[in-house]
Amino acid sequence: MIFRELEKHEAPVLKDFLYEAIFIPEGVEPPERSIVERPELKLYYEDFGSSTGDLCIVADDNGKIIGAAWSRIMNDYGHVEDGMPSLAISLYKEYRGQGIGTTLMHKLLELLKENGFTRVSLAVQKENYAVRMYEKVGFKTVSENELEYIMVCIINS
């Protein structure tokens, strides 16, 4: 398994990983894959690599991308302030729970720091088991609503 930056021609995989990132509570029917075509979700992958803050680390298992952590400056669910990138992360189900997501997060935080960013935000549903991983890598809750936390990580200098 290697961790590397996403190559521009590989950017279409982010659409698939965005679908994988959708938290589906126990007993709830998964949404159609077309949900990622909604304008508020296309923000996460459309024309990725064309803007400042479009950074991505992938987990590559013998040539197959099995996970991705990416950031983008956008007005999304996790938006906190202008100029602060929002983060998304996803792994295929069979690779979860093995520490790969934590490594992806650390690598992306390093890449953000190298690119001059000092903070990054995300939105996560309160029931999502990934909340613990986000806290473990340094994210703190800055606001919440009935269903979600908005979290920010200060990237150490």
Locations of the language-model features?
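Hydrophobic adenine-recognition pocket in adenosine-nucleotide-binding enzymes
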Residues: 6, 89-91, 124
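Conserved acetyl-CoA pyrophosphate-binding loop and the N-cap/start of the following alpha-helix
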Residues: 95, 99-107
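Conserved GNAT acetyl-CoA-binding A-motif
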Residues: 105, 112-125
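Conserved acetyl-CoA-binding loop of GNAT-fold acetyltransferases
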Residues: 135-145
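Conserved beta-strand-loop-alpha-helix junction that forms the acyl-donor binding cleft
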Residues: 96, 121-131, 147-156
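A short beta-loop-alpha structural element at the N-terminal edge
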Residues: 1-16
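Acetyl-CoA-dependent GNAT
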Residues: 22-24, 33-83, 88-92
